[in-house]
Amino acid sequence: LEKKERIIGITSLRLDSPGLAVGTAKGVIKRVNPEVLSSKESWEFINLAPGDEVVGAVELANEDLHLVFITDDAQLLHYPASAVRPQGRAGSGVAGIKCSGQARVIWFGAVDPEDDAVVVTVSGGVDSLLSSETGSVKVSRFSEFPAKGRATGGVRCHRFLKGEGALMLGWAGAYPAIAATDSGAPIDLPAPTGKRDGSGAPAPQPIVAVASRHLAHPGPGGETPSAAASTDLLSGGVSDDQESLGQPELL
């Protein structure tokens, strides 16, 4: 990997797949048509604006999945994948979520609205680090969050307590979810009884990642892909450094 590069997802590159869905820190969404360049080992799949970076990439099983954004100012937006027209790899994407002020997207993925899905949010101070502050954690049913139109602001998904000012982590996916510390030790999460815009409860330890215990959604042919979608991978949000990580590539 190049300096400041990190892996954010895995795809099968199946030509019969609905393709990748990609979300960026500044709220851009892009669906990428499946394409394999046999003459190259890697290639770019989205043109990023200065200061932007990809925070999530997921291979879609079908267009019934909902694309989900979670921002650091506790807004959540989701809508069907069919609301976004696929583009070729040279495209720059379209507005996915309207971020207010200096807010940034900390998580992007895809969720089956028919699943027993949940939303996990962890709040803390504005300058808090995932690995050092426990923060407040909340688990809510995904069904609590109404779908909204693309490029809107979404709905509030977490109420901050005194001393809190941002989400340190956000995640949505199939229930049950599991959390982990920076050493990989599992952390029990509360039951999914949190109100849509309620506050969280003190986390027992700093949570740096959340994932589903379920496998990825079946692929276009009905089989489960060998590579999990981003909704099923441990995810700790955007990088600590908010500078652009360069143009993302498929390898």
For the regions a protein language model found, what residue spans apply to each?
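Short, structured "edge-of-domain" segments at secondary-structure transitions
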Residues: L1-L251
